Every structure is written in C-alpha cells, then in structure tokens.
From Swiss-Prot:
SUPFAM superfamilies: HSP20-like chaperones (SSF49764). It comes from Mycobacterium leprae (strain TN). It comes from the Bacteria. The lineage of its organism: Bacteria, Bacillati, Actinomycetota, Actinomycetes, Mycobacteriales. Residues 21-131 form the sHSP domain. This is 18 kDa antigen. Gene3D superfamilies: 2.60.40.790. Not known. This protein is one of the major immune reactive proteins in mycobacteria. Belongs to the small heat shock protein (HSP20) family. PANTHER family: HEAT-SHOCK PROTEIN 20 FAMILY MEMBER.
Length: 148
C-alpha cells in the first residue's frame, strides 16, 4: 500500500479539487524534425482520448489542445501525480510550410502532425535572359549555370 508522505502534494490535490486547477504545470512534450519534403511534430499525450484533442490553425500559428478529466471526487486518491485538466501548446510555423495541407494522426498516446514544405520554398530553376546570346538556366540547388 502507498503511504502519503508529502503534505504539499496533498495541498495541491486540495487546491485542484476546490479551484478546478492544479498548482503543477501541465506539460505537452514534443519533438520536431524535417523529413524529406515535410516538417514533422510529435506530441506526447499519454492517457488522452482522441476525441478530446482539438487542433486549430490561424495564419501560421498551430494550437493543440487536449484534456484529461479530473479524478472522481468520490475516489480517495493515494497518489495523483498525472496532470489533469486542459493542456495547450502553440507552434509558430515558418512561411515556408504549407499550412493548408497539414495532416494529423493519433496513435498510442502520440499526436503526429505532418506539415508539407510549401512549393514556393522548394528549390527551382530560374531562366535568365542573356540578351542576344540566348537564355541561361540557374539551378538554385547545385549553384550551376546551364546554357539553353
């Protein structure tokens, strides 16, 4: 059996019951990386039900909200260390990402956002007019000039 030994944790629990909030900060840890032509973000949300997730985007700011319901007030808790309540996390995305085509999936407590790189941010070739000598094409990725 677990023993209660931390009086401050009991005060936190009491404050949560009375005020509806916890004195401990709620966290939503994440990893982010680029994978080929997309930007990937994964949030750890163990114990969160998929229907409590809410993802909004306004301009280039993505807001992720999730909720873990509080403990049944009739239950006498011996330990209550998992954060409860509403969690929020905002990401400011660069202009080089296509926010119109974001995909989201949720499996095994991990929310994954896949955000494609915008077409305007991808490398491309630009044709340069050389007057009477024809055109040259500049390959931005290889930094070379090709006679056309």
């Amino acid at each position: 059996m677990l023993m209660r030994t931390d009086p401050f944790r009991e005060l936190d629990r009491f404050a949560e019951q009375v005020l509806g909030t916890s004195a401990r900060p709620a966290v939503m840890p994440m990893d982010a990386w680029r994978e080929g032509e997309e930007f990937v973000v994964e949030f750890d949300l163990p114990g969160i039900k998929a229907d409590s997730l809410d993802i909004d985007i306004e301009r280039n700011v993505v807001t992720v909200r999730a909720e873990r319901p509080g403990v049944d007030p009739d239950r006498e808790m011996l330990a209550a260390e998992r954060p409860r309540g509403v969690f929020n996390r905002q990401l400011v995305l660069g202009e080089n990402l296509d926010t119109e085509r974001i995909l989201a999936s949720y499996q095994e407590g991990v929310l994954k956002l896949s955000i494609p790189v915008a077409e305007r941010a991808k490398p491309r070739k630009i044709s340069v007019d050389r007057g009477n000598n024809g055109h040259q094409t500049i390959n931005k990725t290889a930094h070379e000039i090709i006679d056309a």
